[in-house]
Structures are given as C-alpha cells and as structure tokens.
C-alpha cells in the first residue's frame, strides 16, 4: 500500500504552524513528510535546530521525514556521502538527492548502517537509475521521486512522465510524485505557481490529480508539494487515494428521475470486457432494475463524456448505464442523464 505525504518548509514558516499542519495530516493518515534543505543562507546552527524540531515532532507522530539535499550542501555541512550519521542524528527517514552523484556514491549510500532511505530524482529522463543499479545498491533503501515545478508550464508532460516512471518500475523501486494544493501559498522558493509534477495537474482539484496518478499505475506514494493544504483538500486527497475503486465526478441533468439517480449513484459500476469504441457499458443496472420505469426524456444527441441510461424504447437494454466515448446520434431510445465533469473527462482514457 502506498503512502500519502505533505511538505513543510521550516525556513519559511513557524514551528507552531508546521506542528498544526502535521497534526492535521496525521489525522487523515498521511505518513510521508518532505522538506527541503538545499541551501543554508542564515546561521547554520539555527537552521538545523529548526529543522530538527520539526523532524522530531513528525517522528513522534509516526511520520517519515525525507530531507531534500544536494551535493553542494554536503560540502557546506562538512559531511560525506559515506557517513550519513548527520541525518541519523537529525532523525530523518531518508535523504532525497536533488542532484545526484555518479551512481557509485548513491549505491554505497543505500548500504548505510542506519537504514536511511536514499531517494533519487525520477524526472531527468537519463540512464541515472540504470547506472546506480549497475553498482548493486540495496534496493530496500533506494526510492524514486519525481520533481515538482514551481514555474507554470515547466511541469512534466505526460509522455515524459511515463518514460521516466517506467525506468523505475522496471527495477520494482518505490515511486512518488507531487500534486498541487490550490489553497497552499508557499514552497521552498519565493516564486511558485503551485508545486506539481505534471503540468496538466496545476489547476486541477487535488482529488482529480490523485485519481489520475493512481490510474497510471506508475506511482506508489503521492505528496502535496506546497504548503499548507486545507483540511478539506487533505480529506479529499485521502479519500481518493484510499478508494477501492476510481470515482468520476458527474454533473447531472435537470429532471433526471429517481430511478436514474439510483442507477448512477447507488451502484458500483464496471464496464464490459468487450469494450466498444463508442460507449462504456455498465450492464448490471439493467438487471437490477428491469422492473423499474425508465420513460424517454432528454433524448438529445450524445457527446463525448455524456452519461446515458437506455430508456424503455430499448427493450431488454432498459436501465443500462453508459458513458459516451464519441459523439453519437440519438434515435430517442437513450436518456442523457448527466455528464462527466469537464476537468475529469481525461480520466476516461485511463479506466481499465
């Protein structure tokens, strides 16, 4: 089972606010905590003390803190990749390498005596992970995570995301991607238009982003990149992540009948394996409600994303629930009862 995560940035907030956010995330089952230690511009001891205070509190809740770091900071802190005791003393669950070494160092780091996880960047599209694997790392301690992208239009395209993710899936490594809170206001840098991995996610509701990542089958863990997400977002994300089946938002037509509402919302839908190019068919509603009335109404022509129920004019198909995949003419035997919400239409391509 994958894990949900949040991000906190102690240098840009207060311990009291971070603590309250950790409590809220813990309430909804969040396990991972991402934080960034890419540069230290102020007093080193003060910054590290603030980080440790947050890490200690997260650990007290049973959460796992991943510290984002780059090779330059190893030099600034006078620590070495072959001695991770600094991060062990900090209480970190793992270290994420924002910029990697040569491959040999990463492999050696996975064999540290503290069991600290080493998380590497998944988004570069190079043979980086293949190189690390050639040095026989301890794969129990080797994880992958995508970047997030504060600059609008700089996030990953879907094809590149798949290409990169499959490199890690090939080795059965744990994978993580970031989603974007619409209510959060900051990240590790002053300028940010949200902090998501996929550019197409930037303006979507958080639950929709999560549904998409799950449906790709490529991502284990999902973290919110920016802070602080609202309680409603934390709740909706957890519900989407933990759902036994994917759900789609439906905007119903005015005037749908109670029987049609029952067909739509009181049933678990699955589509037939002999999939049509024109419709997704959930056939069991016609069996369950064969004795119910489905009179003709709203029999306009059908468009991609429309939700349909066959009316009594379709004989034995009466009560069958469908989703239109293409535009189609309506001969009066199909009721258009709703429509997949525009922002989730793209999810139809990912249903399996």
Per-segment meaning from a language model:
Residues 2-19, 67-79, 192-204:
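Active-site mouth loops of central-metabolism enzymes
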Residues 13-27, 76-86, 129-130, 205-212:
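Short, acidic/polar
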Residues 17-39, 87-94:
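Catalytic domains of carbohydrate-active enzymes, especially glycoside hydrolases
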Residues 31-54:
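Glycine-rich, proline-tolerant flexible connector loops at the mouths of alpha/beta enzymes
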Residues 36-38, 44, 68-71, 91-103, ...:
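Catalytic beta/alpha-barrel core
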Residues 47-93, 104-105:
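N-terminal active-site wall of soluble small-molecule enzyme domains
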Residues 121-255:
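Catalytic alpha/beta core domains of metabolic enzymes, predominantly
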Residues 251-352:
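C-terminal functional modules
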């Amino acid at each position: 089972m994958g894990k949900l995560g949040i991000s906190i940035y102690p240098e840009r907030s207060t311990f009291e606010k971070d603590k309250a956010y950790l409590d809220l995330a813990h309430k909804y089952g969040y396990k991972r905590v991402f934080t960034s230690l890419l540069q230290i511009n102020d007093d080193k001891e003060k910054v590290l003390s603030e980080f440790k205070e947050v890490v200690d509190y997260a650990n007290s809740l049973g959460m796992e803190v991943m510290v984002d770091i780059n090779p330059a900071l190893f030099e600034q802190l006078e620590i070495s990749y072959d001695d991770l005791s600094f991060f062990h003393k900090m209480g970190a669950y793992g270290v994420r390498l924002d910029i990697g070494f040569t491959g040999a160092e990463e492999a050696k780091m996975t064999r540290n005596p503290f069991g600290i996880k080493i998380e590497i960047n998944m988004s570069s599209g190079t043979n980086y992970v293949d190189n690390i694997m050639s040095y026989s790392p301890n794969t129990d301690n080797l994880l992958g995570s995508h970047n997030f992208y504060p600059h609008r239009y700089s996030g990953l395209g879907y094809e590149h995301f798949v290409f990169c993710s499959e490199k890690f899936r090939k080795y059965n490594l744990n994978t993580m991607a970031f989603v974007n809170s619409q209510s959060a206001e900051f990240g590790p840098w002053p300028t940010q238009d949200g902090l998501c991995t996929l550019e197409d996610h930037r303006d979507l509701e958080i639950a929709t982003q999560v549904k998409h990542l799950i449906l790709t089958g490529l991502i284990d863990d999902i973290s919110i990149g920016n802070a602080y997400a609202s309680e409603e977002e934390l709740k909706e994300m957890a519900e989407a992540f933990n759902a036994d089946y994917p759900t789609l938002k439906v905007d119903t037509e005015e005037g749908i009948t109670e029987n049609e509402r029952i067909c739509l919302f009181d049933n678990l839908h699955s589509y037939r394996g002999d999939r049509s190019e024109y419709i997704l068919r959930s056939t069991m509603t016609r069996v369950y409600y064969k004795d119910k009335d489905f009179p003709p109404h709203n029999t306009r022509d059908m468009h991609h994303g429309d939700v349909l129920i066959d009316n009594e004019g379709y004989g034995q198909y009466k009560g069958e629930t469908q989703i239109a995949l293409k535009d189609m003419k309506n001969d009066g035997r199909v009721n258009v009862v709703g429509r997949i919400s525009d922002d989730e239409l793209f999810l139809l391509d990912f249903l399996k």
